[in-house]
Structure formats: C-alpha cells, structure tokens
UniProtKB/Swiss-Prot annotation:
The gene is dnaK. It holds the Pfam family HSP70. Keywords: ATP-binding, Chaperone, Nucleotide-binding, Phosphoprotein, Stress response. Belongs to the heat shock protein 70 family. This is Chaperone protein DnaK.
Length: 620
C-alpha cells in the first residue's frame, strides 16, 4: 500500500506530514518552510500561484489574491476572478495540490491518498466540502479527523500513561476545545466545543482597524478604501501580533502608505502589548464559554485535567495563555509545536490506515460536535443523535404522519442545539412518498441517522408497512454536485498540467542561460587553442541561443518556443564540445596551475546540463 499523507488544511497556514521509518515527518515545501500559507493568487497573465509566492505579491495584486477561504467552506460563497467563479472547495484544492506536490517531491513517488483535518466544530456541510476539495486535488480522502483529536494523537505517541487532557486549539480562523482521555492505547474524545468564527484573523482585523483609525486621526485620510494600503496594514498587523508575543512594544513603519495633494504620507506607529490586549480582550474572552461547555459536557472539573495542550499559532499570544491558565488552573503545556502537531497526528492516522507499524495500535474514538435532528410537527427539532456522541454511530426512531390520509412525508435534517428546526443548520431535505392512505399516527416510518468515522451523515426513511425506503447522503451544504466536482477535478488537472509546462519553460530558460554563460567564459579563455572556424561555428550557435534566452518569458512561452530553445541548447552543446575538450586538456597539462575546468565539458559532472538549475533564478 502507498503512503497516506496527513494534511492540516488551515485557515492561514497549512502543513503536510507523513510516516517514514516508523516516525512522523513534517515535509518542507519547495520554498524550504515547514508550513505553507493557505493563499492562492492569479497573476495578470492568468497564471496561478500558491503559498508563500502568492502571499508575497498580495500587496500589488489584492483583487486576485485569496486567503482564509476555509471560513467559507460548506457555503455558497464564490470567488470571482476575471470571468470565472471559484467555489471554496476549488480554492482549497489548489492549496492541497501544492501540499501534494511537495510531498511527492520529498518522497519521490506519486501520492493519491490523504487524511485531512478539520476544526472539531465543523458541521456536516463543511466536512463534506473538505472531502470534495481533496477529490478535486486528486486525493482520495481516507479519513477526516478533528484537529484537536489529531493533536492528541501526536501527543499520545509518546505518552502512554492514562490521563484526561484538554486541547485548546486557536488557529487562524477557528477555535476548538476538546476534552480527551488517553490511556491503554485508546484516545477517546469525551466532549468538544468551539467557535468557527474566532481565530487569529480576527485579532489581525482588530489591529488593522486600530491602524486605520489612528492614521485617520493624524492625517485625515481613510485608508480603508485604498486596497493596496489596506493589504499593507493587514500584513503589518499580523507581523505586529507575532512580535508582541515576545516583545512588549513594536514599531510599525510603512513609508509612502498613501499620497495626498500635500505629497506622500507615511505610517509610523508604536504598538504596545498592553494596547494589543485592550483591542483584542473580548476575542480572548470568547474562548471561555466553549471551554466551560466542553468541561461540563465531559462531566469534569478543571482540577481533574492532567494537562492542557495548546494548538494553533494564535495560542502564542500571552493573553491567550493567561486566559487558559485562569480557566483551567493549569500552566498550559508547550510540548507540542502548535503549527505542526495537527499534521503530525493526521500522518499517524494515515500510517495506521496504511498499515504502518510505527503508528502503533492506538484506537481513536472521536465524537460528533453537534446534535442531529429532524423537523417534526410545529417546527420542533427532534433529536436522534446528541452532540458528543462517539462516532461512527447509528440511531433509528419511529415517526408517523401528522394528518389523515397523508401519502408522503418530507424529511428535513438539521444540525445544531436549538429547540426549533429553523434556528439550526439545515443539512438537506428529501421526501418519502407512496405511503398508503391511513388515519394520522397509523403509518410507521423509521428514520435512521448513520454518522461515519469522518463525521459525515447518511439519513434514511423507511415505511415499515410497505418496505419503501429513501435515503440521502447529506451533501447539499457543500453546494457542489457530483458533476460539479468532476468538472473541478478536470480543471484542477489542467492547472497542474499548466504548472508543469511553465516549470519546464523556466527550467529550460535557466538551463540555456547557464550554458550561454559557460560557453562565453570558455570562448574568452580558450584563446588560439581552437581554430577560427570552430570558434565561428560556436559563436553562431551561441548568439542564436543567447537571442532566444533574451526574448524568452517563461510565463508566456509556447511549447514550440520551449522545444526550439531545447534544440538550440543541444546544438550549442554539440558545437562547443571541442572547445571544452581543449580547455580540459589545457587544464590537465597545466597540472592544476590554471583555472580548474575539470568537468566543464559536456561529459563532466559539473557542466550545467539538463538536470542543473542555475543559481541565479527568479522566484515564481
């Protein structure tokens, strides 16, 4: 069986890991970082870029740069880029494709399977949307697991003694808290709670708003309407937040933030940790209720917790750590890397599914975060499965008709904790018809809820009198039909093919540029060791390739232009062979006294041939 990678698909940053040699390994991306910004951008030429390169160009391309798309998963939100609309699943799939490609580059093999994590408080629609994103990216999602559970799995690898822990997970866009029992090879989630609209992005937004207000007071200019200035302020706010985790004050200096009739304006402000805490106090306070709810649902007092684990980059904020200590009475543990532990846990689960012995025999028992109900007479939400029920789970209940001679029933499936169906999230509706006419209350209709290990819901309704049955896998919330997903898969494959063509163009141009440089250097050093005719032939081929390199733009090179450059490169290599041979002989004859050209010819190991990328490159 092939490798199953573990992916933490985050709001602001994502991470990928894999079990290798019996241990989880975090895979660095092509830029050398162990986490990848969950950012996608489209350039003016229509090229797609993902991760750090996309984040770097956001200031000058704010309209076509997409971030924090995870907050829209499972909704009908669309991103408009030029004439095309993208679903959150499609944008997320682009991030997943990047992570998949990085994993393939590291492992040297194709990857087709993954375990992907989601916030514990994600509803069914959001989980299904995440699976759809994986499918679009070319991944068979073997399991969806909750982020706090994945963190506990990473922690449980090295902690066998029995204990109850709290995982406090404050990420870029979501907040989760889970109470988990670890012991005897079992990781059991006792309760979970959270807030899907609370995370580091909200802290950044508060600071950005403060910057805007302060600048308006000082200069009379509203920067909120200037997209480029706003993006610079957001990036500065994020940077300031991070710096204030270790420093008590930071300076924000943004020259030429805007211009008025008076001339250019500069932004210069000192922000203290005390002011930051004041701006974000209510956000930190919002984490208290989910913590209290999770403890109550688990039937535990804070003193019964053995440890509190911090997960997510936002837990580095000192005020957050202080709040955790206040709520639990425990000094929070920092034994896990908050940016990587979720991906590590996902890779452990992937290793288990792939049969990797290094993943151990840990049994994972997770829960559904929200109650599942159907709408009954009067709009009541009648619960079949309570929140914090261990999954997978199956529950059936008998219902009947509400009116005489009723021949059909509409089943409205809802998720949430409110008493009335309309106040909860509707996951989908379906109809069971063909019920024989009878007095109300006589027909026996069995409704069954079945939640799989991914937390995804299947619902069926059966008329026990006739045996007629209808069932539905809840997918309505993701707003993508099977045909939509198939289309997105094809488009994602096209993007992947375009990326490969573009990389081939970049590599070919860089390779050709390197050969031009080495040939020019060789011509200047060879002197009269080769004939004038040989030099002329080399110079003709050199000038032809040099001209192609000068005109080439890898972003828009056609396949024909790439092939022409490859052919010109081969021609120059062949004609310059004698040139490099003479230099090699000269170097040997000089017994190392002259310049070291060993291996400089086309047969030498250090010649910049097809597999060598020139060091002087432009990041793309």
């Amino acid at each position: 069986m092939g490798k199953i990678i573990g992916i933490d698909l985050g709001t602001t940053n994502s991470c990928v890991a894999v079990m290798e040699g019996g241990k989880p390994v975090v895979i660095a991306n092509t830029e050398g970082s162990r986490t990848t910004p969950s950012v996608v951008a489209f350039t003016k030429t229509g090229e797609r870029i993902v991760g750090e390169p996309a984040k770097r160009q956001a200031v000058t391309n704010a309209d076509k740069t997409i971030s924090s798309i995870k907050r829209h998963m499972g909704t009908d939100f669309r991103v408009s880029i030029d004439d095309k609309k993208f679903t959150p699943q499609e944008i997320s799939a682009m991030v997943l494709q990047k992570l998949k490609a990085d994993a393939e580059g590291y492992l040297g093999e194709k990857i087709s399977e993954a375990v992907i994590t989601v916030p514990a408080y994600f509803n069914d629609a959001q989980r299904q949307a995440t699976k759809d994103a994986g499918k679009i990216a070319g991944l068979d999602v073997k399991r969806i697991i909750n982020e706090p559970t994945a963190a506990a799995l990473a922690y449980g690898l090295d902690n066998e003694h029995e204990q109850k822990i709290m995982v406090y997970d404050l990420g870029g866009g979501t907040f989760d808290v889970s109470i988990i029992e670890i012991g005897d090879g079992v990781i059991e989630v006792l309760a979970t709670s959270g807030d899907n609209r609370l995370g580091g992005d909200d802290f950044d937004e508060r600071v950005t708003r403060y910057f805007i207000d302060e600048f308006k007071k000082a200069e009379g200019v509203d920067l909120s309407t200037d997209k480029m200035a706003l993006q610079r302020l957001r990036e500065a706010a994020e940077k300031a937040k991070k710096e204030l985790s270790s420093a008590t004050t930071t300076n924000i200096n943004l020259p030429f933030i805007t211009a008025t009739s008076e001339g250019p304006k500069h932004f210069d402000l000192n922000l203290t940790r005390a002011k930051f805490d004041e701006l974000t106090h209510d956000l930190v306070e919002r984490t208290a209720i989910p913590v209290q709810n999770a403890l109550r649902d688990a039937g535990l007092a804070p003193s019964e917790l053995g440890k509190v684990l911090l997960v997510g980059g936002s837990t580095r904020i000192p005020a957050v750590q202080d709040k955790v200590k206040q709520l639990t009475g425990h000094e929070p543990s920092k034994s896990l890397n908050p940016d990587e532990c979720v991906a590590i846990g996902a890779s452990v689960q992937g290793g288990k599914l792939a049969g990797d012995t290094g993943a151990g025999d840990i049994l994972l028992l997770d829960v559904t975060p929200l109650s599942l109900s159907i709408e009954t007479m009067g709009g009541i939400a009648t619960r079949l499965i309570e929140r914090n029920t261990t999954i997978p789970s199956k529950k059936s209940q008998i219902f009947s008709t509400a009116a005489d001679n009723q021949t059909a029933v509409d089943i409205n499936v809802v998720q949430g904790e409110r008493q009335f169906a309309k106040d909860n999230k509707s996951l989908g509706q379906f109809r069971l018809d063909g019920i024989p006419p009878a007095r109300r209350g006589i027909p026996q209709i069995e409704v069954t809820f079945d939640i799989d290990a991914n937390g995804i819901v299947n619902v069926s309704a059966k008329d026990l009198g006739t045996g007629k049955e209808q069932h539905i896998t809840i997918t309505a919330g993701s707003n993508m039909s099977d045909s939509d997903i198939d289309k997105a898969v094809r488009e994602a494959a096209e993007y992947e093919a375009q990326d490969k063509k573009r990389k081939d163009a970049v590599d070919t141009r860089n390779d050709a540029d390197s050969i031009v440089f080495q040939t020019e250097k060789a011509l200047s050093e060879v002197g009269d060791k080769v004939s004038a005719d040989e030099k002329t032939a080399v110079e003709a081929d050199l000038n032809h390739l040099k001209d192609l390199v000068a005109k080439a733009n890898p972003e828009v090179m056609s396949e024909g232009e790439v092939e022409d450059m490859k052919a010109a490169k081969e021609k120059l290599m062949n004609s310059a062979q004698a040139l490099f041979a003479k230099l090699y002989e000269s170097a040997q004859g000089a017994a190392g006294a002259g310049p070291d050209m060993s291996g400089a010819g086309p047969q030498g190991d250090t010649y910049a041939g097809d597999d060598v990328v020139d060091g002087d490159y432009r990041e793309v």
